[in-house]
Regions:
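Glycosyltransferases and closely related glycan-assembly transferases
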Residues: 2-12, 18-34, 47-52
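Well-ordered beta-strand positions
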Residues: 10, 54-55, 71, 171, ...
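A donor-sugar binding/catalytic signature common to diverse glycosyltransferases
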Residues: 13-14, 162-202
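Residue-level detector of alpha-helix initiation sites
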Residues: 16-18, 40, 44, 110-111, ...
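Active-site-proximal region of nucleotide-activated glycan assembly enzymes
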Residues: 27-89
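Hydrophobic beta-strand scaffold residues
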Residues: 33, 133-135, 191
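Short, glycine/polar-rich helix-capping loops at beta-to-alpha or helix-loop-helix junctions
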Residues: 42-46, 59-67, 143-144, 180, ...
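Donor-nucleotide binding loops and adjacent catalytic segments primarily
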Residues: 88-90, 97-171, 181, 204-207
């Protein structure tokens, strides 16, 4: 009903279970659907949607072989341009840091990672001997006992200041999500990526 009311020229889907009925409805309404697959191999939702899609855009060259030849289009992943225009000095100022020590930026994913947070905090005294640490730890995952620690700042989430923090970072430690990989690659920053295990995912991040 919504598609008939809106009468879109095209439907764009990034996957996820909510996308399946929308893409199927688009085909029924004769509205072309474009799918974007960020990961190395298609997820379940996109697999279900591919037969109904006009084209399937993908992030990695290796993904093309998993898709119908007449539908696959290698596009990469769009990068927010503002991420490329950060100011390192502003990033240091925002964190209360100086330029005397290099900066490590730790990103635990959109929801944060207990395992990553615990690992960083367990070796924090050693890290702070040689580095300053910016820690994006996720909602409700701040450690109040570390507030005021010199050379260490923690945030649940950062939005507007993120480009400046990226610019200030000398090393990025991050979960290995597709968007994170593409953004860090675009920034040409040294990085350490932490993939999900094969038990917790399709194994794409390990690949």
């Amino acid at each position: 009903k919504l598609l008939k009311k809106l009468k879109p020229n095209v439907v764009f889907s990034k996957g996820g279970f909510v996308s399946v009925p929308v893409v199927l409805a688009a085909k029924a309404c004769k509205v072309p659907a474009l799918i974007h697959e960020s990961d190395m191999t298609p997820g379940l939702a996109n697999k279900l949607c591919i037969p109904s899609a006009a084209k399937v855009c993908c992030n990695f060259p290796e993904t093309v072989k998993c898709l119908p030849e007449n539908k696959a289009v290698l596009t990469g992943t769009p990068i927010r341009q503002e991420l490329l225009s950060g100011d390192a000095r502003e990033g240091l100022k925002f964190c209360g840091f100086n330029a005397a020590k290099p900066v490590i930026l730790v990103i635990g994913g959109s929801l944060g990672s207990v395992a990553v947070n615990n690992a960083v905090r367990s070796i924090l005294p050693e890290l702070l001997k040689d580095f300053q640490v910016i820690h994006l730890c996720g909602k409700d995952k701040l450690d109040a006992s570390l507030n005021g620690t010199e050379g260490y700042v923690q945030f649940e989430y950062i939005k507007d200041e993120l480009p400046d923090l990226f610019a200030a970072a000398d090393l990025i430690i991050s979960r290995a999500g597709a968007n994170a990989i593409c953004e860090i690659s675009a920034l040409a920053k040294p990085n350490i990526l932490i993939p999900l295990s094969a038990n917790a995912s399709r194994g794409d991040q390990i690949l």
